[in-house]
Amino acid sequence: RRALQKAGCPQIPVISVNANGMEKNEGFKFSPGLILDAIHAIVYGDLFMRCLYRVRPYELTPGSADALHEKWKQIAIDSLTDPKCKLSYAQVCRGIVEAFDAFPIDETLRKPRVGIVGEILVKYMPLANNHLVQVLEAEGAEAVVPDMLDFFNYCLLGGEYRHEFLGAGITADMLAKVGIKSIRAVRQPAIDALKKSRRFEPP
């Protein structure tokens, strides 16, 4: 917010995603449908990271992996925003995995796999980490980035931990358990698709 004010754009709202009510977003409500769409979008993003980063270092034609990503990214966007889109969330998850699983790569080549971990913004935002994935790939490595949805699971597990070890109320524990089960259920189509693939490991 401070950065927006300094840039002369104080009217732009900053929406805080938090479950403990520390910040209120006036005029903005998280409806169940919006929350579900947001989780679907995160799952799509996690799938793209898992699939694209796995095959791009081994592509036979430079740029072909990114082209496939762009094609399926638009399909994923349409599934969330276009009522006329006939593909369901589960079908898009399967389509992404199957497309990248069939993508032609150099099967004889194996590169060192390098994990990217750390603070959430730096881990996922190329501008914040100086395009680390591209740097690693240019240096002959295969980048591995943990799923963003696991960060939310980690946050929810904190509710269970605080109840069990720090004396927090049972409400936080119950909400955490419901949240974890809900995320697992929404994520299941992606997990199932990854389990059936040749190249990819499920979370």
Language-model regions: role of each:
Residues R1-P203:
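An N-terminal assembly and electron-transfer interface module characteristic of large anaerobic redox
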